[in-house]
A protein has these predicted regions:
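Polyanion-engaging groove/track-forming segments
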Residues: 1-205
Length: 205
């Protein structure tokens, strides 16, 4: 069986079907949560500073707005901001226009100030930023039964960030990487992760 199709199949099951027996693993790389975090990382990688303020490139921003996890985490204020950004359809979006709700303020701040620098402090800030996004989004969707599987991926994503942080900065180490290298390393590490469901019902996750 193709594990990459499992998330889509599970998401299509009606809510009135309460117990689903799953006998295969769910790959991180095919999850909505991984997709969302990939867009979040891309937003950081494409931030630019012009005329005294930060801007975000539109494509990863719009991709994030279309992600189901992000949409379910959005409150009314976030939805209003997203609607306004879509109407304006700017190529580069000022950071100030992407603020105004706890979710937006967490996501749309800059942790990668110089993508060409292999600064250890910048990578540490980038990793902590990604962890904060996970910690912010997960509670906002945790009560949604349709997001139960994605919450398992949120836990694994956070674990992966902690692990890579320990490798780079544990025991007093300060290993610098280019942000692009960090993103690739994280993708390689998390892309092979799967959440195992071996003959267990999905209820209660």
């Amino acid at each position: 069986p193709d594990e990459n199709l499992l998330t889509a199949v599970l998401n299509s099951i009606p809510y009135d079907i309460r117990d689903v027996n799953v006998t295969m693993g769910l790959p991180m790389s095919g999850s909505l949560f991984y997709d969302m975090m990939s867009h979040v990382a891309s937003i950081q990688m494409h931030a630019v500073f012009r005329k005294g303020q930060w801007f975000f490139y539109h494509k990863p921003v719009w991709d994030l707005f279309s992600n189901d996890v992000f949409r379910k985490a959005s409150d009314e204020k976030t939805e209003d901001i997203v609607s306004e950004i879509r109407k304006e359809a700017g190529y580069y979006i000022p950071m100030e226009k992407l603020s105004g709700s706890p979710l937006m303020d967490t996501v749309f701040r800059v942790s990668v100030t110089d993508p060409k620098s292999a600064s250890a402090s910048q990578i540490s800030a980038f990793a902590e930023y990604l962890k904060e996004v996970v910690r912010t989004v997960a509670p906002l969707v945790s009560d949604d039964p349709g997001m139960a599987v994605e919450m398992e991926f949120a836990k694994e994503y956070h674990k992966g960030l902690t692990m890579i942080g320990d490798c780079l900065f544990g025991s007093g180490k300060k290993r610098g990487l280019l942000p692009s290298t960090f993103v690739r390393l994280l993708a390689q590490m998390l892309g092979t992760v799967s959440v195992p469901f071996r003959g267990e019902p999905l209820k209660g996750l």
